[in-house]
Amino acid sequence: MNVPATRKDLMIVNMGPHHPSMHGVLRLIVTLDGEDVIDCEPILGYLHRGMEKIAENRTIIQYLPYVTRWDYLATMFTEAITVNGPEQLGNIQVPKRASYIRVIMLELSRIASHLLWLGPFMADIGAQTPFFYIFREREFIYDLFEAATGMRMMHNFFRIGGVAADLPHGWIDKCFDFCNYFFTRVVEYQKLITRNPIFLERVEGVGVVGGEEVINWGLSGPMLRASGIQWDLRQVDNYECYEEFDWEVQWQKEGDSLARYLVRIGEMMESIKIIQQALEGIPGGPYENLEIRCFGREKEPEWNDFEYRFIGKKPSPTFELPKQELYVRVEAPKGELGIFLIGDQNGFPWRWKIRPPGFINLQILPQLVKRMKLADIMTILGSIDIIMGEVDR
């Protein structure tokens, strides 16, 4: 009987791209020696839509619906960064009530994003059951979003100087009920997942990255805090009104996939604490600074000129961006989401540079998967938590 010779040459495997509703249009060219990963090359750009160039031809209000398509699972953060930049450039005061509403929406969005990370992450490593429990809780958050903003996703809720609408009657009580309910659910997840020996075998010691490495690579968010660095922009920058709440930065020192999971679980618990404090202390008053609406009003056309005769609808008042430059950032669920904004005394930004956390966190993937097994790629990639909408922009 002839035994076939053992194959000794390396094999190249393409992983992805998948549909955007699945893991996204990320393509990995993986070089394998048997099941050992020798090299991994991420190929990006399948979801590139030119978001930075679009911003240069839109006013901020016109651009707001676009930004929800970056990280389409945590849209409140992209809206927050879009209005925070012009607010800081123009020294616009945000009413206290609007700031509290923003914090509540941001933390609900953080929980929803972490839930939608946790469900598929567990399914990727072989645990299907938590997926259904997690989506049940996520639907409750989307019900709250729908009641307040009119949309379950892509909310278009933030405005320069405040928010688009006040909270409806009874919404605060419903949000309190959700917080009390969800707290018990997170405890259930920890019993179901954290102490599961099969889960621990798949994630413990997989994808380890040290504290010095994460700083050198410029990583942020749970990737940074899971490696022993206590850095959270909500405490460092004190944007909105986070300094008025009592909460703790979640961090671990191991730097592996398990540590990143524990950081995100802890962040969901802290988000509930912040929401409860904000609901209890939310002040009265206006939800939007209406004075800024009169900025940049167009001149009235003469009765006989071209605009009067041929342009039926006059342009709405726009906010003029001062001739300055500014970098503004928020702590998104996936890391530091930043905007480098250059104004030019115009309604349109001269430059709108996006710093997406997923794009920068993804850079370390080839280093983390080298000398690991093929099955560990999905564990490590899942623990990084990327959304291709913000990676490709």
Curated annotation (Swiss-Prot):
<dbReference type="InterPro" id="IPR022885">
    <property type="entry name" value="NDH1_su_D/H"/>
</dbReference>
<keyword id="KW-0150">Chloroplast</keyword>
<keyword id="KW-0813">Transport</keyword>
<dbReference type="GO" id="GO:0016655">
    <property type="term" value="F:oxidoreductase activity, acting on NAD(P)H, quinone or similar compound as acceptor"/>
</dbReference>
<dbReference type="InterPro" id="IPR029014">
    <property type="entry name" value="NiFe-Hase_large"/>
</dbReference>
<keyword id="KW-0934">Plastid</keyword>
<keyword id="KW-0521">NADP</keyword>
<dbReference type="InterPro" id="IPR014029">
    <property type="entry name" value="NADH_UbQ_OxRdtase_49kDa_CS"/>
</dbReference>
<comment type="function">
    <text>NDH shuttles electrons from NAD(P)H:plastoquinone, via FMN and iron-sulfur (Fe-S) centers, to quinones in the photosynthetic chain and possibly in a chloroplast respiratory chain. The immediate electron acceptor for the enzyme in this species is believed to be plastoquinone. Couples the redox reaction to proton translocation, and thus conserves the redox energy in a proton gradient.</text>
</comment>
<dbReference type="GO" id="GO:0048038">
    <property type="term" value="F:quinone binding"/>
</dbReference>
<comment type="subunit">
    <text>NDH is composed of at least 16 different subunits, 5 of which are encoded in the nucleus.</text>
</comment>
<keyword id="KW-0618">Plastoquinone</keyword>
<keyword id="KW-0472">Membrane</keyword>
<keyword id="KW-0793">Thylakoid</keyword>
<dbReference type="GO" id="GO:0019684">
    <property type="term" value="P:photosynthesis, light reaction"/>
</dbReference>
<comment type="similarity">
    <text>Belongs to the complex I 49 kDa subunit family.</text>
</comment>
<keyword id="KW-0520">NAD</keyword>
<dbReference type="InterPro" id="IPR001135">
    <property type="entry name" value="NADH_Q_OxRdtase_suD"/>
</dbReference>
<dbReference type="GO" id="GO:0009535">
    <property type="term" value="C:chloroplast thylakoid membrane"/>
</dbReference>
<keyword id="KW-1278">Translocase</keyword>
<dbReference type="Pfam" id="PF00346">
    <property type="entry name" value="Complex1_49kDa"/>
</dbReference>
<dbReference type="GO" id="GO:0051287">
    <property type="term" value="F:NAD binding"/>
</dbReference>
<keyword id="KW-0874">Quinone</keyword>
<protein>
    <recommendedName>
        <fullName>NAD(P)H-quinone oxidoreductase subunit H, chloroplastic</fullName>
        <ecNumber>7.1.1.-</ecNumber>
    </recommendedName>
</protein>
